């Protein structure tokens, strides 16, 4: 099916589904419609396991939004559909770059829509149905609608012709829905990937493809041996500092008695924030030292051991915070904030696990970002599939 056919079908679907209809249910149906249409328009050789998984999650997310109609379910539908579309078109593009592609296409619509040759394919012989539709329906209908509104301002009786009729037709609503449908159809089916994005994709591989130069230090004022030693000393000192913090942190959480619920709430959130900030900084430090050569440096064994110990200690810190949050929930009930604490702590723990794998398997820093992208997507799906407010 040609691109402009897909756009017109999308416009028609938006008008039919959303004209004076309930948004949540019909948006779910629209999501299922786009998922199936994307599946049928994707080449069979590109329907790999990831694509099929995204197809299933798109269907489930659409059902979830039709049932719950909340913001998280809408986000899940939006992300799932565009991931499905991008994956079926550019499967070798790293998922982290899908965000950049989407943002560029969302805001470049006005510039690209006037490049008609990009999205409207002329028929080779004779007149196609789309050509006939544009000639006899779309263009005349557009002019009639514009002048209808012009004349409506000059005569109340003329304006009430449709308003007072049994058809109860609202042309303005149809036009707005058509514009929205065209915008959605255009950015969904006619998205472009710039050349610089393909160049960025080369730098986001999970594995090192070139021979890494171990003799090139990060800073000019430090040689490679000094940098290795500084990393070991830094991580060793941080391990000692973190060990002391873990002991004091757990003592304050599990042995000190809090006088009021408000005080306990404030202390819990402050400690969780400290844990999350500690995890982020820990991962950044490890990414700095293991960005290139030290992944393959035989002399960096002690540095790797120190980094793994630091990851384990940070993991212990996360587990302590999870246990304390569970205790807090059992005493004062479940709220969205406390569920949010679980979400952030879970993501922090997943980040530590992937950081450990990165060091163990000698992966690039991009490996961590690629995996965390899918982990974040999985978190959105979990949040959208369950009615947490009803628990």
Kindly give the residue locations of the regions a language model identified:
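Hydrophobic alpha-helical transmembrane segments in integral membrane proteins
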Residues: 381-391
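Short aromatic-rich membrane-water interface segments that cap or initiate transmembrane helices
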Residues: 164-178, 261-277, 334-345
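Hydrophobic alpha-helical transmembrane segments
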Residues: 124, 129, 134, 170-185, ...
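Juxtamembrane membrane-water interface segments of multi-pass membrane proteins
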Residues: 1-3, 44-47, 116-131, 160, ...
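Membrane-embedded alpha-helical segments of integral membrane proteins
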Residues: 309, 314-358
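Transmembrane-helix bundle segments that line or gate the permeation/cavity pathway
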Residues: 15-156, 177-201
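Membrane-helix interface motif
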Residues: 146-161, 244-259, 319-327, 390-391
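Alpha-helical transmembrane segments and their cytosolic membrane-interface
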Residues: 1-37, 300, 308, 314-320, ...
């Amino acid at each position: 099916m040609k691109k402009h056919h897909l756009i017109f079908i999308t416009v028609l679907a938006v008008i039919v589904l959303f004209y004076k209809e309930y948004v949540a249910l019909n948006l779910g149906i629209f999501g299922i419609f786009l998922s199936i249409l994307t599946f049928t328009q994707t080449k069979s050789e590109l329907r790999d396991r990831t694509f099929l998984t995204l197809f299933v999650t798109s269907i489930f997310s659409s059902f979830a939004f039709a049932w719950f109609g909340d913001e998280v379910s809408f986000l899940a539908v939006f992300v799932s559909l565009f991931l499905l579309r991008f994956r079926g078109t550019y499967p070798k593009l790293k998922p982290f770059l899908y965000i950049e592609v989407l943002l560029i296409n969302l805001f470049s619509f006005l510039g690209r829509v006037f490049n008609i040759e990009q999205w409207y394919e002329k028929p080779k012989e004779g007149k196609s149905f789309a050509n006939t539709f544009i000639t006899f329906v779309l263009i005349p209908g557009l002019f009639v609608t514009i002048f209808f509104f012009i004349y409506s301002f000059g005569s109340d009786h003329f304006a009430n012709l449709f308003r007072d009729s049994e058809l109860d037709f609202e042309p303005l609503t149809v036009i707005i829905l058509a514009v929205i449908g065209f915008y959605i159809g255009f950015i969904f089916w006619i998205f472009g990937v710039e050349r610089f994005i393909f160049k960025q994709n080369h730098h986001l591989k999970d594995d090192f493809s070139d021979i890494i130069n171990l003799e090139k230090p990060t800073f000019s004022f430090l040689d490679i041996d000094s940098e290795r030693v500084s990393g070991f000393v830094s991580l060793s000192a941080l391990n000692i500092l973190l060990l002391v913090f873990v002991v004091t942190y757990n003592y304050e959480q599990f042995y000190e008695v809090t006088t009021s619920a408000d005080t306990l709430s404030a202390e819990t959130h402050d400690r969780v924030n400290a844990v999350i900030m500690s995890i982020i900084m820990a991962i950044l430090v490890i990414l700095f030292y293991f960005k290139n050569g030290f992944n393959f440096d035989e002399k960096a064994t002690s540095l790797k051991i120190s980094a793994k110990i630091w990851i384990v200690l940070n993991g212990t810190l996360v587990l302590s915070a999870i246990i304390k949050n569970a205790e807090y929930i059992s005493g004062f009930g479940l709220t969205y904030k406390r569920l949010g604490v679980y979400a952030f702590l879970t993501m922090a723990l997943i980040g530590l696990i992937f950081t450990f794998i990165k060091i163990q398997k000698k992966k690039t820093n991009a490996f961590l970002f690629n995996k965390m992208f899918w982990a974040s997507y999985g978190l959105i799906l979990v949040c959208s599939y369950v009615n947490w407010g009803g628990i």
